[in-house]
Curated annotation (Swiss-Prot):
GO CC annotation terms, alphabetical: Golgi membrane
Cofactor(s) needed: Mn(2+)
EC annotation from Swiss-Prot or TrEMBL: 2.4.1.86
Effect of T12S: In strain: 129/SvJ
Expression by tissue: Ubiquitous.
Principal place of residence: Golgi
Pathway: Protein modification; protein glycosylation
Protein name (Swiss-Prot/TrEMBL): Beta-1,3-galactosyltransferase 1
Length: 326
């Protein structure tokens, strides 16, 4: 069995490399960069992006799972579910996470479930590669919306829906991105503390208090007619936040009656405000890149903009030097 899995893994890696090389020379890589104005985005019911959001007063989230892991929480209820937003071409990033901080077997006696979140790609080759990857690792879920920057909110809501439907008895959930390094020791033992009673209606991360950017050239541009207020409610940076599992269902159900926004973290903040849940500030969450040093990284929970190579290097260094004092 092990040799079969190894062969499948090697085959998948080779196929990924071949496919990505082919795509790089035959297709543009900026199909879904989010640089186009809203009016140019696809508007078909199953394939819509946020171009038609102004005419949609509610969000029915009528998408189907193309890839699912409905039994992932069946045998053992996880203490923590990790939802990682990723894109089809980021195989190396997913594999780096599987082999480092996202390894579900890192903590004896503490069940962790790691899942990568994806939409549907316009390229059937990439969809097929992700399906093969899923058959090997069983840690990917996909719904049939177009995977794009402007649909990150749908991706997060898919994760919330999955937890509420298939893993509602978990204690905590983390939502993060594929270029984030997570100090799991700090997250598990210093923040969540498995020996204590699980919290309810709990939400924490790097809290941002700000308002909409009206410059159309900005990545975070927010049209006035989509969000007319001058301030956002407090929200946690989408690079990484933690919440009690009961909040997943609360946010998902609230989203069904809350006008969608393309800025995922802002939208989650809007849902929290409706629910009367105030996100707590935690200085361990960083939404920027930070130069590596052993002692510095021992004090944090998340660090942004980490490449797969850096992920391995940081993990190996921290794992081999646990006996050293700072």
């Amino acid at each position: 069995m092990a040799s079969k899995v190894s062969c499948l893994y090697v085959l998948t890696v080779v196929c990924w490399a071949s496919a990505l090389w082919y795509l790089s020379i035959t297709r543009p890589t900026s199909s879904y960069t989010g640089s186009k104005p809203f009016s140019h985005l696809t508007v078909a019911r199953k394939n819509f992006t946020f171009g038609n959001i102004r005419t949609r007063p509610i969000n029915p989230h009528s998408f189907e799972f193309l890839i699912n892991e409905p039994n992932k929480c069946e045998k053992n209820i996880p203490f923590l579910v990790i939802l990682i937003s990723t894109t089809h071409k980021e195989f190396d990033a997913r594999q780096a996470i599987r082999e480092t901080w996202g390894d579900e077997n890192n903590f004896k006696g503490i069940k962790i479930a790691t899942l990568f979140l994806l939409g549907k790609n316009a390229d059937p080759v990439l969809n097929q590669m992700v399906e093969q990857e899923s058959q090997i690792f069983h840690d990917i879920i996909v719904e049939d919306f177009i995977d794009s920057y402007h649909n990150l909110t749908l991706k997060t809501l898919m994760g919330m829906r999955w937890v509420a439907t298939f893993c509602s008895k978990a204690k905590y959930v983390m939502k993060t991105d594929s270029d984030i390094f997570v100090n799991m020791d700090n997250l598990i033992y210093k923040l969540l503390k498995p020996s204590t009673k699980p919290r309810r209606r709990y939400f924490t991360g790097y809290v941002i208090n700000g308002g909409p950017i009206r410059d159309v050239r900005s990545k975070w541009y927010m049209p006035r007619d989509l969000y007319p207020d001058s301030n956002y409610p407090p929200f946690c940076s989408g690079t990484g936040y933690i919440f009690s599992a009961d909040v997943a269902e609360l946010i998902y159900k609230t989203s069904l009656h809350t006008r969608l926004l393309h800025l995922e973290d802002v939208y989650v903040g809007l849902c929290l405000r409706k629910l009367g849940i105030h996100p707590f500030q935690n200085s361990g969450f960083n939404h920027w890149k930070m130069a590596y040093s052993l002692c510095r990284y021992r004090r944090v929970i998340t660090v942004h903009q980490i490449s797969p190579e850096e992920m391995h290097r940081i993990w190996n260094d921290m794992s081999s030097k646990k006996h050293l004092r700072c």
